[in-house]
Every structure is written in C-alpha cells, then in structure tokens.
C-alpha cells in the first residue's frame, strides 16, 4: 500500500509539471501572489526514520513558511525563497516483529527547512525543501514487557515510557495546486514523510 501511495504521488508531481508547461509563466519574474506567511495544516504519512522498527506512522502536522526573498534568488524567473518551520506528529500502532502489537510509539518532528518555490503557472508551483529536523520518539508497552526484548539501535526499548531524541537531515519535493490567491492544495514527498495539506496564504 505504501508503494502505491508513493507512486501515485510521483505521478501527481509529473502530471503537474507537464500540464504547467503548457501555460508556463516561469519566465515572468514576480508574477505570483504576495504573502507574508503561508500556514499549512496537513496529514502525515511517515515512512522513513521510523522509531526502532519498520512500520508506517499516521498523524497530522502544521507548517508556517515565511518568504525571505520575494523575487529570487534567481531574478530572471518566477521564484521565491522562504524559511519553513514545522510540527509533525505520527502514531505507530505496533512494534513490528518480533513484538507485533505488544507496544506502540509516537514521533514528534520539528523540521526547519529552506523552501525554494518555482511558480510555473497561476495554478501550479513546485518546490524543493532541505533542512534539519529534530525527531522525538516515544514508546509505550501495552502490557508486560517480553523476556526476549533487546536493545534496538543502541536504545534500551525494554522499559516503560522509553523516549529518544535525534537530529536528521530532511528533504521534501512538493507541488501546490492553487484554488485561489489565498488557498492551495499542497503535497510533499520526501524523507521522512508524505504530507498532504491545504495552504493558506496570509
């Protein structure tokens, strides 16, 4: 199922690029709506950097992106540069093998990224994001901790209320589909997650 979601997301990005090129305004610098901040609530599917096992987590999150350069850094095309701050939460229902449903976990992410937007048309914009993310992982056992429990990735997961903090490089590629100058549907695919949200430009 996860592979199908990723393939569909890639297809959406590819189709958006093809359709946008027909009415491209990428060569018209500054031809995009001005905004002070972009707020984006979204759904989260975390498929990478899972806490101690191979499983997908489902949750919600929020992004706030603030333009740093309104027309640039390349002044000959329609682009801008923003800094983006996020808060994402994902829940993992089970530990996976060998413990299965004996425990579950939660991840909280605090990403800070640079976002480079390319406005291809009045409807479609594409953007890469690169930065760092703080990952806070929590594990909770649903019952008695099994005797065969072992350390995973150097962390003792065999206690109640286990937690761990890590710092990761994060990367997303995204597309926006504008419904108006103030509202857009936004999809991101990258590491560690797939994000589906609605952007509100203020």
Language model features with spans:
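Residues on the lipid-exposed face of transmembrane beta-strands in outer-membrane beta-barrel proteins
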Residues: 41-45, 60-66, 87, 110-116, ...
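Short loop/turn motifs that connect adjacent beta-strands in outer-membrane beta-barrel proteins
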Residues: 25-36, 69-81, 119-126, 179-183
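Predominantly the C-terminal beta-signal and adjacent terminal strand-loop region
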Residues: 27-34, 86, 153-202
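Residues that define the transmembrane beta-barrel architecture of outer-membrane proteins
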Residues: 35-37, 54-60, 104-110, 124, ...
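Cleavable N-terminal export/targeting peptides
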Residues: 1-32
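Flexible, solvent-exposed loop segments that connect beta-strands
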Residues: 51, 88-106, 136-166
């Amino acid at each position: 199922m996860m592979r199908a979601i990723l393939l569909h997301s890639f297809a959406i990005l590819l189709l958006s690029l093809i359709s946008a090129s027909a009415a491209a305004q990428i060569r018209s610098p500054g031809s995009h709506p001005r905004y002070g901040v972009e707020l984006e609530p979204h759904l989260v599917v975390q498929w990478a950097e899972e806490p101690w096992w191979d499983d997908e987590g489902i949750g919600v999150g929020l992004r706030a992106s603030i333009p740093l350069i309104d027309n640039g850094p390349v002044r000959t095309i329609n682009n801008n540069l923003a800094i983006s701050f996020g808060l994402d939460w994902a829940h993992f229902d089970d530990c996976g093998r060998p413990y299965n449903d004996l425990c579950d976990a939660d991840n909280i992410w605090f990403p800070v990224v640079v976002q480079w937007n390319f406005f291809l048309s009045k409807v479609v914009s594409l953007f890469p994001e690169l930065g760092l993310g703080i990952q806070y992982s929590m594990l909770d056992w649903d019952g008695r901790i099994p005797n065969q429990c072992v350390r995973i990735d150097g962390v003792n997961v065999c206690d109640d209320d286990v937690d761990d903090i890590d710092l990761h490089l994060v990367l997303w590629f995204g597309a926006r589909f504008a419904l108006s100058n103030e509202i857009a549907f936004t999809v991101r695919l990258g590491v560690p997650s797939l994000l589906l949200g609605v952007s509100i430009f203020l």
